[in-house]
From Swiss-Prot:
Name this polypeptide is given: Probable D-serine dehydratase
HAMAP family found in the cross-reference section: D_Ser_dehydrat
The keyword Lipid metabolism belongs to this UniProt entry's keyword annotation: no
Species of the source: Bacillus cereus (strain B4264)
Catalysed reactions, as listed in the record: D-serine = pyruvate + NH4(+)
Pfam families according to UniProt: PALP (PF00291)
EC number: 4.3.1.18
Source taxon at top rank: Bacteria
Family: Belongs to the serine/threonine dehydratase family. DsdA subfamily.
One biological process term in Gene Ontology: D-serine catabolic process
Amino acid sequence: MKEIGALQAEYPLVNKLIATEEVFWINPHIEKYERAIKDSPLNEENVKDAEERLKRFAPYIAKVFPETKGTNGIIESPLVKISSMKEALETTYKQPISGELLLKCDSHLPISGSIKARGGIYEVLKYAEQLALQHGMLTEEDDYSILDSDTCREFFAKHSIAVGSTGNLGLSIGIMSANLGFNVTVHMSADAKEWKKDLLRSKGVNVIEYEDDYSKAVEEGRRQADADPSCYFVDDENSHDLFLGYAVAASRLQKQLEELEVVVDKDHPLFVYLPCGVGGGPGGVAFGLKLLYKDNVHCFFAEPTHSPCMLLGLMTGLHDKIAVQDIGIDNVTDADGLAVGRPSGFVGKTMEPFLSGNYTVSDEELYRLLKELADTENIYLEPSALAGMIGPVKVCKEDEYLQKQQLTEKVKKGTHIVWGTGGSMVPKDVMNEYYRKGLELTV
């Protein structure tokens, strides 16, 4: 890897990253959709396959998780207009936001209350299906609710699943795996919140805690799983299945936009702002959206100033060969879901030609935005889930991207979607504490 001095000379923005200042980065490697998709390791067929699998599992999900009965076992979240929050943002940052502002409430996804309910649950279901098909317990034509039986649970109990997580991925994989009957172990990094560990233990999940950061928890989890032939490791850094589970969100969002009569075409651009940790969740969602809307959707990743791993990897082209700690950043943030020092190389390389840009936001800003959203819309998110909220302000303020893409006028007829990644499962006392911090920082 290059010396820090060489990186600073070649990429002046590195200096601001080191100083943990907020930055806005436009991706110089973005390509037109038709060109980018040609070299992509994944395609529309892969996403459709994931979508079909989730439909097959819908009867099982509806039976085992009553909260999904209303959607017939499809795990989906609301898309809501947040006009009052938009006004508050414009007033606070003295910056008009051209276009409509919507919030995708993955914070309120059933089962595990975060975006990770998409990829995490999907990968566990895919593995369960594979085992059940191999052992003649299921055919693809069956009603999958038959998996909710003592026989199936006893069968799955002979197998184990492991994952490394800062919290939310562990919740979705732990809850789903335990329900099916698997023995499940979640390796949790130092920044994982106590309530998330407690919730997992209450579901019968084995939680192993580490004093190190996320990368160490994943590494240990992978090592222990490798030593056990009956253990399946969900690899958050490299998993195509997780990525595809997230990508399914796009076609669901498309239907919701149509219901709200929101048009997306070359004259009505769509901007999407996604909090980013290791990259799988935002990468998968953005990839799915690109497949549908091609050059008419513009996706931005949002990271904490103390954990800008994806921005660093993309900007330098080093991807997972560089960690924020290599340039002296501590990777300590209250945005626990985004506290990742080294990005996924698979996601970075896959998304490089599709991603519009990346920006960072301070913890203090996240708390202020948390309070503002609660006050204006009565929606409570966890700190990491607010990273996308400042995106529309940044894109409209730093209008270089809009100019480059010839969107300065079109943005007025466009739509901004902030992806709210988690929060509904946060205990009330913890959420009150978050709100109090936001209040202190606002006064």
